[in-house]
């Protein structure tokens, strides 16, 4: 790792769990932190120094990190109230250079390191792989009527999915589409990062962005960025009749699926956690679910390891 830092002309490297859409719950194939440390938890970044590699995990993953990390990696176990970046900063010398992958951190997070010497990297030296994503075709709901005062660049995938009505059910535990969007009277949807970058480079006017969700890379391309916290969250809180009916239908289906799983547990013998997960998937899909919203958290005998992989041991 010393040679890598020397080659990049930096003293430290921040290694992220997020991908280029700033999504933490992404495939391990594009998770640089997993590539470096072997830790498969959904959150937590790593820091490479000239002497050590540090992995930062919250209370959900203290035991799992010890079980999974590669040798010679120091696990920093965050306690309640501790913030990851605060602990990272304690390991930094402000006079030395921290390398940050511009496409994998938000502009807001980058600015939180003000006062430290930063070198932005265009590509990830640990894992620069990016999964391919399909062009969205499924319209789950009608598009929303959202008319901002000025041209707005939206980078939050949940918000893009909400405004367009598009959904992508090809990925596990996700229905959001992988796209960015500009609204300037018309709606311009970018499913290709290169096309989006070219648009940002050539756009000469003011562009409203949310620093909490735009990557530092995209932000640097914009000539006249105006930061404004997204108001789409408030818009999402007002449900249409169609959305309310969809919720009611989903709640009813969930009740039926969970009652069936409960009956399975009560009546079957010699089953494992993995058996129950398979049954849960079956019952939800039987009720019409396209997929599960998140990986099941199911524990019978290892309650302290809620987020680790399910066991096949019979119970």
Language-model segment annotations:
Residues 260-268, 302-307:
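N-terminal glycine-rich flavin-associated loop
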Residues 211-213, 289, 304-315:
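Phosphate/diphosphate-binding loops
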Residues 17, 154-157, 260-263, 292-297:
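Short coil/turn segments at secondary-structure boundaries
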Residues 1-90, 105, 109-203, 307-310, ...:
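N-terminal accessory/capping or targeting/presequence segment of soluble
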Residues 10-15, 20, 281-295:
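Short beta-strand/loop turn elements enriched in aromatics
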Residues 81-116, 121-147, 172, 208-224, ...:
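Extended, domain-scale alpha-helical bundle/helix-rich regions
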Residues 22-26, 291-305:
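Short, basic/aromatic beta-hairpin or loop at an interaction surface
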